[in-house]
Structures are given as structure tokens and as C-alpha cells.
């Protein structure tokens, strides 16, 4: 049987690494855009929206539905990028630890 103290040390390392990754995810910003950049959504890799920017030139009360579509598209783009960054950071979580393959 493996030394339980060694396993506890490895668990502590994993927890420390996880805390560091969580902090990095909070600081990592991604930008989703739509309509050639007229709508931008900035969020962190924890999927928390930080900013929404809309070019005033596209604000037209007769075309609100187009603006709504652009906002939704920019949000989807930002979410995709945030999830990619998160997966990238989480993939490094188990580096150097003797864990079963595919666990993270």
C-alpha cells in the first residue's frame, strides 16, 4: 500500500495548484466579438462578464433585433473562448502527479 502521508502531500499540492489556477482563470480575459467587432463582450475565463461594448453607430431603434443577435453572438464567442482557456489551465492541473490518465 502506498504511503498515506505521501498521498496527503500530493493532495495538498493538487489543492494549491487548483487555487492558483482558479486565480489565473479569474485574471485571464477573453473577448468575444460579433458584426466585425461592433459588439464586444469581455469576460474572464471563469465566465464572468466584465464589459459589454457596443459601437454607437449600430444603435438604431428600428433594428433592435439585429443588435440583440449581435450581442448573443458575441456572448457565445466569448463563452467559447473562456471555456477553451479554462480547459487549457485545468489540463495542467495534474501535471507531475501520479493520477490515472484522463482524470483531468
Swiss-Prot record:
Keywords: Cytoplasm, DNA-binding. One of its GO terms (cellular component) is cytosol. The keyword Transcription regulation does not apply. Gene3D superfamilies: Nucleoid-associated protein YbaB-like domain. Its main location: cytoplasm. Disulfide bonds: none annotated. This is Nucleoid-associated protein DICTH_1981. It comes from Dictyoglomus thermophilum (strain ATCC 35947 / DSM 3960 / H-6-12).
